[in-house]
Regions:
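ATP-dependent small-molecule kinase phosphotransfer cores
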Residues: 35-92, 104, 112-125, 131, ...
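Post-Walker A helix-loop "phosphate-sensing" segment adjacent to the P-loop in P-loop NTPases
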Residues: 26-33
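ATP-binding Walker
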Residues: 15
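Small-molecule kinase domains that catalyze NTP-dependent phosphoryl transfer to phosphate-bearing small molecules
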Residues: 121-176, 193, 197-210
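Walker A/P-loop
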Residues: 18
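Hydrophobic anchor at the beta1->P-loop junction of P-loop NTPases
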Residues: 9
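P-loop (Walker A) phosphate-binding loop of NTP-binding proteins
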Residues: 12
Length: 210
């Protein structure tokens, strides 16, 4: 069976999905797509915060449906990286990557990002203290679990859906991207694949030269 040259990257908030997707796309020479970018464009156009978007999406699924249609349209593409919460669901034939991390690490990353990025602070994407950020992240995850369970009967945070699970808590996007690259090249060469839960060694680099 010929593998699709598509990688979908999902994971927890703060796990480095966008940064990793950018670097994997660069390594492979692939085109990157992001549902997160689409959401941010909607927020800017509608003058909404992320919190307002999530609240509205609980009752109005039109926004989610628009993003899902966009993702389904990417199935005809090749040589692409897709950073999306439900990419694995809409493109099940892709190499499905999940980026995990400790929630305390996620909280600190998101808080630091907010402090250094005034635009995102104004958007309401994050709150003003570590405790508030932690609460917001957990509420966001539970909201998405509930919403997507209702819409598609799928939990986007269930790691059993994925081919490769990486804990990014202690590693840079570059290191994580190299790990994705390495396993993806192995995945392309085989018809069968058992989920890999990767604990990246410190100082990781390419295992093989391609």
């Amino acid at each position: 069976m010929e593998r699709k040259h598509i990688i979908t990257i999902s994971g927890k908030p703060g796990s480095g999905k966008s940064s990793t997707a950018d670097k994997v796309a660069e390594l492979l020479g692939y085109t990157r797509y992001s549902s997160g970018d689409m959401v941010r464009n909607i927020l800017a156009r509608e003058h909404m915060t992320l919190a307002e978007y999530n609240e509205k999406a609980n009752d109005d699924h039109a926004l989610d449906t628009k993003i899902d249609e966009y993702l389904r349209g990417l199935r005809t593409k090749k040589d692409v990286i897709i950073d999306s919460r439900l990419g694995f669901y809409w493109l099940p034939e892709s190499f499905k990557v999940y980026l995990d991390l400790d929630m305390q690490v996620a909280t600190v990353r998101i808080y630091k990002d907010a402090v250094s990025n005034n635009m995102r602070t104004k958007s309401g994407e994050v709150a003003s203290s570590l405790d508030a950020v932690s609460k917001q992240v957990r509420e966001r995850m539970e909201n998405e679990r509930r919403r997507f369970k209702e819409m598609y009967n799928v939990d986007p945070y269930n790691i059993e859906h994925f081919d490769l699970v990486i804990d990014t808590s202690r590693h840079t996007p570059q290191t994580v991207a190299l790990t994705v690259y390495d396993h993806y090249r192995q995945w392309l060469k085989t018809d069968t694949w058992k989920q890999v839960r990767s604990s990246i060694p410190l100082g990781y680099s390419f295992k093989n030269q391609y």
